Amino acid sequence: MRRIITILLLALTIGEAWACTAVIVSGKVTADGRPFIFKNRDASDGTNNSLLTLHGTKYQYVGVVNYSTSSSPTSIWYGHNEAGFAILNTLSYYFNSPTSKANTGAGALMKKALGQCATVDEFEALLQQTQAQTTPVTLSTNFAVMDSLGNVAFFETCNTSYTKFDANDETVAPNGYLVRTNYSFTSPYYDVTNHVGEQRYKAACKYMEDTFGDGKIDAQQVVHELPRYLYHGKREVNLWDDIPDDINDVTNTYFSNFIPRYTSASASMMQGVLEGENPINTVSWIAIGWPCGSFTVPIVITPSRVLPSVVKRATDTHKSEMCTNALQLKNNVFTIYHDGTQSTDSIDLSKLINLEETGILQKVMAADAQVGELGMTLINQLRAGAANETEVAAYYNWVDDYWREFFNQAISPITTITTDKEDDEAYYSIDGIRYPSRPTTPGIYVNNHHKVLIK
């Protein structure tokens, strides 16, 4: 059965080049008492993300960077350091003026903060110093910060001022958590910004309310589910409500302004520590690459700076293997038009989810649960002093092998068939080149997730 689902969102859509979704949560309302900050990162000009470990003026830290050939990129887009300080941001549109969304200084400031800040107070002091400079840094952003003392807050920030929102303050965050997307409530242009990202704001709020209600918030559940949440906050459409029969039940579906989107580049939940716990036990759970097509891996800081090979920036390509692979999986989900071009706002839903549970998201979720379970065992051992860098390296090696096995199975066609028939409504691909109809050149092509031998 071939179906087309059209979700009428175009009239509601505003171009969001840097459209991120963030949640901060007080340790008062989490299942284990540890605070955390979460970000689903979108970046139209930086979708190939990777991890680096660097050393700032005071502290070693791990952070996510865009593709770059520099050994020390100028910007970090989220991360945590050995003192237990963590930071992320979302772009806040039109904070300084009703026509400008410039935010060129946020990445550099986050890099500086990771290298020298241990607490939220120290970050606030750095922010004050930055805004007091003769030539202010261009900022139009919502920073989220957390420290080993249990402090966790948003800073809605423009060029010359900021407002702090403390998640531990019940008058500010009655439910113990706060959500931000791409606007700021304190912006003088709040009423004329069209509240960019409001769809995702409403979706994130609904997820938190529906999933946890008055109960304790599970950090691992949030990072496992929220970056893959298929609910549209404004249209109140859940793509799980009418899913295709199987992977060949082509269902072209408009896919824009969900939390996961074409430009989603990575996701992270940075979890803090309990009172008195060693700050080195702060952990970043990171899905590098399109989150619907990648694993969430716990990242800790070690003396030798060990990282999984598949998530760190490679010395030759300057990209991460998992991110590159996840982008390939993403390309198999988004609609290919008959002229061979790819849509950025339409997916074949059957390739993402279906009743036979062979969609890429369903495969990812199942594998991600295993990665998370083993990762949580390791983190608990580290917290108890029952594991060290050797165990961390062994787990990372397992992640490398498991990811490569998973990807090869996910990207490889299910069966091999020989055909002389032409399917003019499907695309064929080989070595990354896509054809809108049956090619004439012999070879083994991917067609509808099957391997097709054309003679």
Can you annotate each of these PLM segments?
Residues 4-13:
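Sec-dependent N-terminal signal peptides
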Residues 411-433:
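Residue-level detector of functionally pivotal "anchor" positions at catalytic/ligand-binding pockets or at interdomain
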Residues 444-455:
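C-terminal tail/sorting-segment detector
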